[in-house]
């Protein structure tokens, strides 16, 4: 499939696109743990805000980014591009669009987390000007550890 990036539409996710987004996330993140089940994550996210952005090309959802904003910092939580649409500028356009949208609501800094072993994705974000910061990321499951 030849991708025409000039015909891509990048916008906020719309209700009714759930199945397309779920299918994309299952394709891109096949080994996600059960607590990251896409349908419940989407539902929970939309109860908080609408910071889910999608890329549509020829009527097909080929990319998505779930973002967050705490009133100061923004976050890129999940960036996904269908495997057949990668290395064609989709992810770059999506990340730039998401950062622009975050800036428009007052965001002054954008953060993200990736696995330290994921060198390909690390290089992708470094190319935007992200840098590795001296931070320690911690997490605990509510109800199990807390």
Residue spans for each PLM region:
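Conserved N-terminal entry element of GNAT/NAT acetyltransferase domains
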Residues: 1-16, 145-146
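Active-site/acyl-donor-binding loops of N-acyltransferases
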Residues: 128, 135-144
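Conserved acetyl-CoA-binding loop-helix of GNAT-fold acetyltransferases
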Residues: 87-100, 127
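Acetyl-CoA-dependent GNAT
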Residues: 12-78, 101, 132-135
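Conserved GNAT acetyl-CoA-binding A-motif
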Residues: 102-114
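Conserved beta-strand-loop-alpha-helix junction that forms the acyl-donor binding cleft
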Residues: 112-121, 143
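A short, internal acetyl-CoA/4′-phosphopantetheine-binding micro-motif in the GNAT/acyltransferase core
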Residues: 79-86
């Amino acid at each position: 499939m030849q991708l025409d990036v000039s015909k891509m539409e990048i916008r906020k996710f719309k209700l009714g696109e759930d199945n397309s987004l779920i299918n994309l996330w299952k394709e891109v993140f096949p080994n996600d743990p059960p607590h990251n089940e896409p349908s419940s994550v989407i539902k929970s996210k939309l109860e908080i805000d609408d910071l889910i952005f999608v890329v549509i090309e020829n009527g097909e959802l080929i990319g998505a980014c779930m973002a967050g904003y705490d009133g100061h910092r923004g976050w890129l939580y999940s960036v996904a591009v269908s495997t057949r649409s990668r290395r064609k500028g989709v992810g770059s356009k999506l990340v730039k669009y998401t950062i622009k949208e975050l800036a428009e609501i007052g965001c002054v800094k954008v953060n993200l987390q990736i696995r330290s072993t994921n060198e390909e994705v690390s290089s992708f974000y470094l190319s935007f000007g992200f840098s590795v910061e001296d931070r320690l990321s911690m997490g605990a499951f509510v109800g199990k550890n807390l």
